[in-house]
Structures are given as C-alpha cells and as structure tokens.
C-alpha cells in the first residue's frame, strides 16, 4: 500500500502546466481537426533525426501488401517471428533487440502486455489501418506520452481518420475469401453529426481452417501431410469519436474489443503432427485523449486508458492438466504532456505517465503480482536553418509487489538520448542518434513458477545510429527517395532461461549481445500520362552476436532467429485497365538456438507474390476488386523451427465504399 501511495505522491507532486499543439517546431502548420500535420509524413520521415520508415495506405495497395506480416517485411531492420497461417502468432524484433524491446502504439497510445511483454501483431488487420510507421530511436514528434519513448523501437499503427465535414453517412463493406477456408467480412460506418462531432464504428470477423499442406524430407523419404488443429475464429470491433469542443481543444475516444478462439498447431516432427491445444484471447480497452491549445506557445495533452486482457489456455490432452491455465491482466494508465514553444527555434516537452498493472491466473502457484510505474520525460528540440537537434532525459520508476508473496525488486533509472539532423543539400540530409533505454522484467520472467526469478535486474540497451537520406527528382516525372543507416547496438544483463537442474529452468541476467548492422531503402516512381511505375526495395544486414562468455564455444555466434541478410522488394504498374504488382522478400539462414547445432539450423528462403486490382464506379459507390496470389512458386519454408509456413495460396477481396 505504501508503494501505491508513493506512486501517487510522485505523480501529482510534479508541477502541472498547460500546453499547445505544436508537436515539433514552429513553421510546421498544425490543425486540431483530426490532429493532422500539413507536412507530408514521408517527407518528415526523411528529415527526422532518427530512422523513421512509413507505409501509408496507398503504399500498401500499390506494393501488393496483403496482411500485417507482409507489411512488416517491407520495413527494414525487422525480424518477424511467424508460427504460420492466418491464426499464427506474429511478433517482431527490430535490429536484433528482441520482441520485448519493440513497442507498439495504436492511435497514439502504447499497447500493453505485462505478462509476456510481446505484442501479437496477428490480431491487427490492415483493413482499418491508414499507415504504419517504424521509428528506431526517438520520435520526431516530441509531443507524446513518456511511455512512447521507453523502447528502442516503436511500431505505430494509425487507423483510418474520421470522416470529412459533409455530414453524410459513409460506409465501407468488404469481403475477403481465400485458400484453406479463409473468409473475412469487414464493415466500417462513419459520419459527421455536426461540424464539431464525428464518429466511426468498425466490425470485422475472420475464420480460417488453416489446414494447408506441407512436406518433410527425412533423408530419401518424403512425407506429405496437412496442418491440423489450426482453426481460428476471430472477431474485432471498435468505436471511435472525435469532438472539437472549441476552436482550440479536442476530445477523442476509442472503445476496442477483440476475441479470438483458436486451436494451436504443435511442432511438426517426422511421423508426428498431433496437437490438441487451444487458446482463447480476449482484449478490451477504452481510451480518451484531450488536447488543448492555450496560446500560440503553450499546449497540453492528456490521455487515460483502461485495458483488460484474458488468455485461456487448454492443453487438450488430459482434462485439468497442470499446464492448463487462465490468465487475466489489467492496466489503468494516464499521461499528461505539456508543450512549450517560446520562439521559432526552440520547443520543449514535459510528459509524465502513471500505470498500474496486475496479473492473476487459475494456477495454484499464482502470487497475483502487481506493478506501479511512473515515467517522466523532459525533451528539448532546437531547429535553425539546416540543423535540428533533439535531446531527451527519461526517468523510469517501477514499484513491484505481489498479493500472495514477495514482490520483485523495485527499479529506477535515468535514460538519456540525443539525435540530430543536418541538411547538407536541399535533397540530402545527414542524421545521427544515440539512445539508452532499459527493459524491466515481465511478470512471467519475475513470477512464473520455477521459471521466474524475483532477483532479476533490468536489461540495458544502447543504440548508436548514423545515416543519410535523399529525396529528389531524377527527371520531371521520376521521383526517388533513399535512406542508408549504419548502427551499433549493445544489450547487457540480457534475461535468459538457463537450466537450474535436469528438469527446471530459471531466468537469470547472464546475456550480452552486440549488433552491427546496415539498413538501406529506396523507392522510385515514374509517371507517364495515365501510367505510373513504382519500385521499392529494402535491405538489412544484422551481425547480431552472442558476447556473453568469451570462454564459451558459442561465443560470437549469431543470435537465435536473427538472419545476417534480409530484404524485400516490389514493382507496381498502375494503368487504365488492371493494376499489377509483383513483390517478394528473402531471409538468410538462421539458427533456433545460440549454440548453432546442426539440428537447429533453419534454411534461408525467398517468397514471391502477385496482385492485380481495379477500382471503378458503380453509380455513386466506388468498388475495388483485388486478387492476390501468395507464395507464387509454392516454396516450402519455416520461420520458426518445426512450424511450416503455407505454400501457394490465393485471396480475393471485394470492397465497396458508399
């Protein structure tokens, strides 16, 4: 109880000021309506002081992006862990840091997962997404909650904006159907009820059998089988509103619900493809965001969120099996940000966040842990002529406890960061950044029976980046953008599971890793009358090495599941008849463990897909028909060892806008 009281004392003893909506520097026009920024998002990414990569809705269409996993392959530095099929869990790590170090923001508010620390991105479809932004280091927008700065990399999911001011109802109806029993209806309704108030409602359902065929080779013997126990039923609904309470203030809100009942296919071994496991994931959250511009120099942003999530796991083999368990987590979260821009060169932000998390389960060993978190961020940004410099100091305080037992160690840390951008030429920018951050252990790492340890320290990370960006014209009808970033990352006190005895593993701080890498991207567009050709490529090199123990035979091995080389590319042709895009990605060889035994080797792979689409009018409604072929050459491969990915598949999408 004392820890909770101290958390509130710290939170509310901080001087509360108010503030104005100018998220970066004077000279960039802002509007309260939909909180839009007049400068093109791609242009801002190229001028950012830290690497920032954007995929907007049009990019996804012209590049033939089919789903969230496909979109993530188009972003540099990302390593995707995919268990296969429409219902397979999908998590991402960025530049070798691991999935627990990747934050995910949904409409400006960070998603929470206090149990495992990993966000499953398979639950977020692209049908309601306006753009995806990957930021490595500090965000160019400093008017953000303090929590948004607590990870080495952040994936921002921005949903479709509210409707225009025509006061007419707008509706989108869509149906997807595809291989392996896949079907997904989607409906979105939006309307401005007045020139100040608008709302939107979204509903989505996904069903898939996921019974795709696969092949295993055992010497000269070939085994052909189909994935089983892989069915999923998933539903998602959300309601959004936006209310301009005055010409200088705005209130927005979101209510979100997700429910997914899925079977869990097990690992595939020779002569074994049996699994009866099932998992039901449920998630509800509601959030409010309020912004007020007090003057030309001062703005304030406040938000609050409540999150509830349940994971109901059934082993399915023996009723009441010891591994069966229902897990429930909750979070209450609030944030206040104050922005002050005294002149056209300087802008300052102070943000303070408070969160309360707890977790309980049906396991007899459950200790019902909880955590109070206070995060403060002080940021300064300076811009003059061709130079932009940003510095941040982040203070994090974690107060841990358990209702039935002892809590983990409390943690507090100061984390600095510094970044800059310099305009060498009108189309050419140089950038450099440095950031320190740390990750508190998850509840599983602290409290899970036998596996967890209350004595764990936080993982510490350091990241250093230097890069160059270019945006210009090769001719009057050909545009080119390109980026190249060289980086060095270091992780110390890495949390790893180690064998305590023959049967029990325990988490300990023993790991150390160093990552040296290179990210390169390029995108070109050429227009000829009613024809447009677009090409986009990205390449990543990640030399992610295990530097835990120089005496170990596994020292300097590539980290598990981290490919040395990866890349993706697409080519699109828009024309008056049928638009076409060809896309593909390739991943180098990997190992499923740091020991690099022959049995843990995973071959590299490449995959190619094709898309055709056409948009046309049927009276006033606008129709769009799209046909995708994934894994065009029917390649057999694995991303996670012993979890085969689907071969060739198709998907038909019919979309109507009224």
Task: Label the model's feature ranges.
Residues 341-489:
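Structural signature of Gram-negative outer-membrane beta-barrels, strongest in the C-terminal barrel
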Residues 344, 482-490, 509-593:
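Gram-negative outer-membrane beta-barrel transporters
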Residues 301-313, 431, 458-516, 521-525:
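Membrane-embedded beta-barrel scaffold of Gram-negative outer-membrane proteins
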């Amino acid at each position: 109880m004392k820890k909770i009281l101290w958390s509130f004392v710290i939170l509310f003893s901080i001087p509360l000021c108010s503030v104005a909506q100018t998220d970066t520097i004077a000279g960039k026009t802002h509007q309260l309506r939909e909180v839009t920024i007049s400068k093109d998002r791609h242009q801002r990414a190229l001028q950012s002081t830290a690497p920032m990569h954007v995929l907007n809705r049009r990019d996804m269409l012209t590049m033939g992006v089919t789903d969230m996993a496909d979109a993530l392959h188009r972003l540099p530095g990302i390593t995707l862990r995919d268990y296969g099929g429409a219902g397979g869990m999908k998590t991402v790590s960025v530049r070798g840091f691991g999935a627990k170090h990747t934050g995910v923001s949904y409409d400006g508010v960070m998603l929470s997962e206090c149990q495992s620390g990993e966000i499953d991105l398979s639950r977020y479809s692209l049908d309601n997404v306006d753009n995806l932004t990957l930021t490595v280091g500090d965000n160019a927008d400093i008017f953000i909650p303090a929590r948004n700065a607590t990870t080495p990399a952040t994936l921002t999911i921005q949903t479709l904006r509210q409707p225009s001011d025509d006061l007419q109802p707008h509706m989108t109806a869509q149906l997807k159907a595809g291989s392996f029993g896949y079907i997904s209806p989607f409906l979105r309704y939006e309307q401005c009820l007045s020139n100040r108030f608008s709302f939107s409602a979204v509903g989505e359902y996904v069903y898939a059998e996921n019974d795709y065929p696969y092949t295993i080779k055992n010497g000269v013997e070939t085994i052909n089988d189909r994935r089983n126990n892989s069915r999923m039923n998933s539903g998602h609904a959300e309601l959004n509103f936006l209310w301009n309470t005055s010409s200088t203030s705005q209130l927005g809100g979101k209510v979100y619900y997700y429910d997914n009942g899925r079977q869990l296919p097990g690992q595939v071994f020779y002569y074994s493809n049996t699994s009866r496991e099932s998992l039901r994931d449920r998630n509800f959250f509601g959030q409010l965001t309020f912004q007020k511009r007090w003057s030309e120099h001062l703005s304030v942003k406040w938000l609050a969120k409540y999150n509830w999530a349940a994971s109901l796991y059934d082993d399915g083999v023996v009723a009441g099996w010891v591994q069966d368990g229902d897990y429930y987590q909750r979070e209450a979260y609030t944030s206040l940000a104050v922005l002050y821009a005294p002149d056209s060169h300087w802008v300052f932000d102070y943000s303070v966040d408070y969160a309360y998390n707890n977790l309980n389960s049906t396991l007899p060993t459950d200790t019902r842990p909880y955590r109070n978190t206070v995060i403060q961020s002080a940021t300064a940004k300076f811009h003059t002529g061709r130079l932009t410099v940003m510095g941040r100091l982040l203070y994090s305080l974690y107060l841990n406890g358990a209702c039935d037992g002892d809590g983990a160690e409390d943690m507090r840390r100061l984390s600095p960061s510094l970044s800059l951008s310099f305009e060498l030429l009108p189309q050419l920018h140089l950038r450099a950044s440095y950031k320190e951050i740390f990750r508190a252990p998850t509840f599983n790492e602290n409290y899970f029976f036998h596996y967890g340890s209350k004595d764990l320290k936080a993982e510490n990370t350091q990241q250093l980046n230097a890069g160059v960006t270019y945006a210009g014209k090769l001719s009057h009808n050909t545009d080119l953008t390109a980026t190249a970033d060289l980086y060095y990352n270091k992780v110390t006190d890495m949390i790893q599971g180690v064998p305590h005895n023959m049967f029990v593993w325990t988490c300990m701080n023993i790991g150390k890793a160093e990552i040296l890498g290179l990210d390169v991207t390029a995108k070109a567009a050429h227009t000829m009358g009613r024809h447009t050709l677009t090409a986009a490529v990205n390449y990543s090199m990640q030399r992610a090495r295990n530097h835990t123990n120089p005496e170990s035979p596994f020292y300097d091995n590539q980290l598990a599941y981290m490919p040395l080389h990866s890349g993706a590319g697409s080519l699109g042709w828009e024309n008056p008849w049928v638009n076409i895009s060809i896309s593909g990605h390739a991943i180098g060889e990997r190992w499923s463990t740091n020991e690099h035994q022959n049995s843990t080797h995973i071959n590299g792979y490449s995959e190619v897909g094709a898309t055709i689409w056409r948009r046309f009018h049927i009276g006033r409604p606008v129709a769009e028909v799209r046909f995708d072929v994934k894994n065009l050459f029917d390649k057999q491969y694995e991303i996670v060892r012993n979890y085969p990915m689907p071969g060739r598949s198709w998907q038909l999408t019919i979309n109507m806008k009224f």
